Amino acid sequence: MVITEMTPRNTIAAIATAIVPQQGSVGIVRMSGSEAMKIAQTLFHAPGKQVWETHHILYGYIRHPHTGQLVDETLLLIMKAPRSYTREDVVEFHCHGGIIAIQQVLQLCIEAGAELAQPGEFTLRAFLNGRLDLTQAESIAELVGSQSPAAAQVALAGLQGKLASPIRHLRACCLDILAEIEARIDFEEDLPPLDESEISQKLDDILVDLSMVLATASRGELLRTGLKVAIIGRPNVGKSSLLNAWSHSDRAIVTDLPGTTRDVVESQLVVGGIPVQVLDTAGIRETEDRVEKIGVERSCQAAESADIVLLTIDAQVGWTELDEVIYQQVKHRFLILIINKVDQVDLVHSELIRSIFYPETIKNVVATAAINNQGIEELEAAILNAVNLDNVQPENLDFAVNQRQAAALTRAKIALEQCLNTIKNNLPLDFWTIDLRGSIYALGEVTGEDVTESVLDIIFSRFCIGK
């Protein structure tokens, strides 16, 4: 999407509900712009004495404006500017579900003068018209795409301005310091000299707060993209049973025959608020079976692509030569050792396994009995601990910055550090202002106070059409 002007004048239309193979009960066509009401009045016929007032719902029919042919029986929602999502006149046709009806309604809107909306254009208008800042706009996209309650909670926090608030405060502090410096440059003879130690302390305080905001980036990335976890090991150690116990389902086939799992079986879970894609893989061993050999290759590929590898062994057998071979293949990955089937051995045997049956270099070890659901909580705790997120719950979250925001905040941090070095090296005040301006601009990029059209283009093109 190319933004040619910063003040939209055309009227846009799009289908606002998801288009899926399964038909929903309702489909919505949304319009926004100065001509939205006029187009709606051309297409929509409300029987009786219904009043076309803002924030009212009308009942009626959509007919072709030239032929009078009935298209659908609908509800019409009216939201006049500025009390709308975009702060423009907005109307929504609530049609019967099914792609044919809503596509026909959309086509009539376009024929009547509306333009097909680009991805994210409704939210872009909300931003350009001052209803949302850029962090709030991005939070809407993140809320729509959230895969867990914790991710949704973080997105809602951003939508409520909890991320923008500290960023604006830091930017205001930088602007205050810049004003002090520029006043000394312009009115050097009329004002006392700057206290360099005081300015440096203020910059240090800003850097501390900025670093705290930046520290949420890794948490935010995990909440948005999740983790990929691969369960690997030799045949018949209970990998599929572990997946089934963990996912509370029968996703994987379980038998006593080696080589039952011949392909990667996936399951989507949420662990401590983090979306987790779990991959149950074929048992790794030397085999002449062509199909099983392909499965073994895919197991190795899954281990390479995973964020965390669960190397699973059998407590009844202990650490075998094949376990050692597999370990050597995956030891460069982040590894958690799963000692499965501990319910089949006595306590003494279990302690022996813990002490001598696996390399001392494996520090993360969890004992499980998948068939009895034993050890699942400990496994989840080990995974969260592995990514330093052992308490990511909605009640413990305020906000988390995304990748774009983190990049801008990093630029702001670097500029502030350069400003401190400039002061330390006794360079002229003009040099101080260069670094400070760089930091102020970078902070403004986060909230949208200083942002280029190309950046807006990238951000809003990631939205769905109709949002």
Swiss-Prot record:
Q: Which InterPro entries match?
A: G_TrmE, GTP-bd, GTP-bd_TrmE_N, GTPase_MnmE, MnmE_dom2, MnmE_helical, P-loop_NTPase, Small_GTP-bd
Q: What is its EC number?
A: 3.6.-.-
User: Superkingdom, according to UniProt?
Assistant: Bacteria
What does the record's cofactor remark say about binding? Binds 1 potassium ion per subunit.
* Major localisation: cytoplasm
A single Gene Ontology biological process assigned to it is:
tRNA methylation
UniProt KW keywords:
Cytoplasm, GTP-binding, Hydrolase, Magnesium, Metal-binding, Nucleotide-binding, Potassium, tRNA processing
Record bears the keyword DNA damage:
no
* Protein name, as recorded: tRNA modification GTPase MnmE
What does UniProt list as this organism's lineage? Bacteria, Bacillati, Cyanobacteriota, Cyanophyceae, Oscillatoriophycideae
What gene, per UniProt, encodes this protein? mnmE
